[in-house]
Amino acid sequence: MKLTRSSAIVPDTDVTVAGWVHELRDLGGISFLLLRDRDGVMQITMPKKKVPPELVEHVRSLSRESVVRVAGLVKEELKAPQGFEIIPYEVELLNAAESPLPLDVTGKVRADLDTRLDARFMDVRLPATRAIFLIRATVLREVRAFLSARDFIEIQTPKMVATATEGGTQLFPISYFDREAFLNQSPQLYKQMMMAAGLERVFEVGPIFRAEEHDTRKHLNEITSIDVEASFLDDHEVMELLEELIQHVYVTVAERCSAPLQSLGVTLSIPHIPFKRIAYAEAIEIADIPWGDDLDTAAEKAVGEEIAEHYFIVDWPAELKPFYVQPRNNLCYAFDLMHPRMELASGARRIHDCALLVEQLAGKSLAPENFGFYLDAFRFGMPPHAGWGLGAERLLVTMLGLANIRESVLFPRDRRRITP
């Protein structure tokens, strides 16, 4: 079936298009079928004097959201949704939609988020919802292009593991034949091992799983993480890489996603780099919390309102960061990238000395013998390295001003939702 997408239609040509019945309108002497494809809504115009009455009756019988194919002549019509109309000479019903519909995809009757997620296949037909995922695809494509252009190699790491990557109990256990395993909470250990392998610069875009019982607008249990690790770079250099990536993504989305952004009513403000750096000590002073406390939602909000732009928090207490972060007295070479609304990424200069790593594992109450496969990589020539992990969903939420992180995922997994 050779079809023309609505965005590629040229006036005064014969075309064949296909899509969903968006709306039907009958004004007596003229009828309209609004047909929707991925690119937008097309106006199919049926004047009684130009279109056979049996074809008009056939179109009038169509149910909303039925799938149809239309062949006809394109005419310029500036009042039509995309500046043209199609005078049909053939309308074929490909599949009829049942009634009533689970959602109103015209946007005239709004549904709550849970109802939309329950009927997600319908919800994505809404222009504003579809726009989120067109932009998401652009963001992830540009992340890959940006890192590949800087000599990073894309890798894929295991999502089923035998032990915790970063310690703690935030793991989903699974049955792995005759023994217990877990869904991986981070590719951290594996991307570090690739530094010992000599790949030098790697990245991964893939799912991670956190068994956290949060039920908030900014937490999910399955997340798309953008992870980077680089040999012979320090924390400052990978921070620069991260802020350059963020700016690049904003610029590219603004340039290439004008229609989806318009559907969302969003005008992007491009962040300026370098981002501001503040020490943990300054952050807790702004938030009025004691030394040694992590920043909770209220603290993040207080600091975000003060800074009012993207910023890094640096000079963290070593006790608040994972075992693989390079310590510096009672501090460490770690950083968090923050948006005024929430944390976006965390990273650090890593430990590359095996003896220190074993010491840090024990200090975090983790058994070094459970990390033998990982520690081996540090015994035979591990270079200095640094890296970070960036949440794709949080990047989208803050970029587009979405109210809930679930809006940025086709089928979110949270504390309550495991279907569809």
Residues covered by each model-derived region:
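Extended, domain-scale alpha-helical bundle/helix-rich regions
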Residues: L233-L245
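Hydrophobic alpha-helix position signal
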Residues: L147, M194, I284-A287, L361
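Short coil/turn segments at secondary-structure boundaries
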Residues: P102-V105, R136, Q156-M160, E204-P207, ...
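TRNA-recognition modules of translation machinery and tRNA-sensing kinases, especially anticodon-binding
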Residues: A197, R201-E204, T216, T224-D234, ...
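Class II aminoacyl-tRNA synthetase-like tRNA-binding/catalytic domains
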Residues: K2-S231, V397
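Extended, non-catalytic structural segments that build the interaction scaffolds
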Residues: A131-I135, T267-H272, A345
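Metal-assisted phosphate- and nucleotidyl-transfer catalytic regions
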Residues: T165-E166, Q170, E244-P340, G363-D376, ...
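Alpha-helix capping and helix-loop boundary segments enriched in small/acidic/polar residues
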Residues: A181, H214-D215, L233, P271-P274, ...
